[in-house]
């Protein structure tokens, strides 16, 4: 006769897992039926184990009744492809200059490589994900932007800022029970001036722009009335006194972030500005989460303590 026994340690582990599930229950109940926008980026995009874990997290959100919308960039993959094609990357003030030649690569990599791979990973769990880009169905609209270096205006080429979102295409995919996966390129529009009435004032140029995935995700979250914006990055969260790791901020209000923003490290400014924009435009919560940790998004969303940094409206200081 075969006898099976369970060690005390394994039973303790099982009880810990049960406790984690019970802890998640009120958060699942709270966010079921809401839309969550997740910006996918950083190391989570290039590490195979983390990529698989991210896809599992998205499918988990889907199955507990949350409507995930994934927005992604692809900086590492773009750099790799430009190198393989012998196209030199130019940077001004730390920002990439996107030439027409480089823009062709950006579109190819974001929509044809990164987006397709992520859709495939999610769909390995079932027919859930649908890929789209900011060009599809007039989803995103952008204006060309530059930057200032040492007091001088600098042209960054085909780089833009999202100024409009038509969420109808995303809503159609969500209503069909699917998961939208959005790559961040956007058609360029120009302002015809006050003399042009109504919607005709903003005209497409036929050009496509490379847009920042953090700010694009914030714009999409605002347009959808999302309950959460989650930005995956390569740090644990926002620090009050970087690089002091003990100064990690677990939660702060929009006003507190607004005061801190000018003093932040340059790499964190676009991410935290995106969080602030989302909160200012009605998103309930915005989170910065360490994408180097597998399943970090679930830990931040479904545990009481969380592991990253959340930004909340001024009138609500408690999570």
From Swiss-Prot:
Q: Tell me the pathway.
A: Amino-acid biosynthesis; L-arginine biosynthesis; N(2)-acetyl-L-ornithine from L-glutamate: step 2/4
Question: What is the catalytic activity of this protein?
Answer: N-acetyl-L-glutamate + ATP = N-acetyl-L-glutamyl 5-phosphate + ADP
Note whether Transferase occurs among the keywords: yes
| Pfam families named among the record's database cross-references | AA_kinase
What protein does this entry describe? Acetylglutamate kinase
Q: What is its EC number?
A: 2.7.2.8
Broad class of enzyme this protein falls into: transferase
- For the ligand (substrate), the binding residues are 74-75, 96, 210
List the InterPro entries hit by this protein, alphabetically.
Answer: AceGlu_kinase-like_sf, AcgluKinase_fam, ArgB, Asp/Glu/Uridylate_kinase, Glu/AcGlu_kinase, NAGK-C
User: Where does the protein end up?
Assistant: Cytoplasm
